[in-house]
Regions:
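Non-ligating segments of multi-cofactor redox enzymes
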Residues: 1-211
């Protein structure tokens, strides 16, 4: 999916009107989160794919600073990005080309910030406080609804290897839910399945809520 990001940045630079396509990646994640959590982030986000496939090769893979996960910081980033978005609208004008350029500027700048943070810390550092990711996490069902995908961890998990946490792009800890029939329902889980594939004892599996 990462090639979509690269094509977008090039095409929308020369044809500003194409910049409005980015609205799909602003609305899509939140709408999907209502039923599937941050599924979009792990499967359809071009920028997330870029971080996973490209930035990860050059990343230092350090721990993501805890403060960027805090509610306060995420609210600040949400307000800041939308404020900048509004300012860009004012500066570029409310025309198709102007709106497209606004979207393009936003995607370019935040992608660069994400790449820099990805090099310094972990590839998906940006994803921990991405405004759309934050909104998606907020609307994610806390108890899970019918059809809601989640990671289930068997009671047989001894939480010794913690391999699932080591491969999690969001640096979460799925092993914490070992034996819990509700499964791992962290709102920032992007449902990528890395933890399931990496589990050496195969005590993790992907399930869907039935109720």
């Amino acid at each position: 999916m990462f090639w979509i990001l690269l094509i977008y940045l090039v095409m929308a630079y020369f044809v500003p009107e194409l910049g409005v396509i980015a609205i799909i990646c602003m609305i899509g994640p939140v709408l999907m989160a209502v039923k599937k959590g941050r599924y979009w982030c792990g499967h359809f986000c071009p920028r997330g794919s870029f971080y996973d496939r490209v930035v990860s090769r050059f990343s230092s893979h350090k721990r993501i600073p805890q403060f960027v996960r805090s509610k306060g910081f995420r609210i600040f980033m949400l307000c800041f990005i939308f404020a900048m978005f509004g300012l860009q609208f004012y500066m570029n004008g409310v025309t198709l080309a102007g709106v497209g350029r606004t979207f393009w500027n936003l995607i370019l700048v935040t992608t660069i910030v994400g790449v820099v943070l990805g090099f310094i810390y972990a590839p998906r550092t940006w994803c921990t406080f991405c405004p759309m990711g934050t909104l998606s996490a907020w609307v994610t069902p806390k108890g899970g609804k019918k059809g809601f995908p989640y990671v289930w961890v068997s009671l047989a998990c001894q939480m010794k290897c913690k391999r699932c946490a080591k491969v999690c792009p969001m640096q979460l800890t799925p092993y914490d839910s070992g034996g819990d029939e509700n499964g791992y329902l962290h709102p920032d889980c992007i449902k990528c399945g890395n933890c399931i594939n990496a589990c050496p004892t195969k005590v993790m599996e992907k399930r869907k809520c039935q109720e």
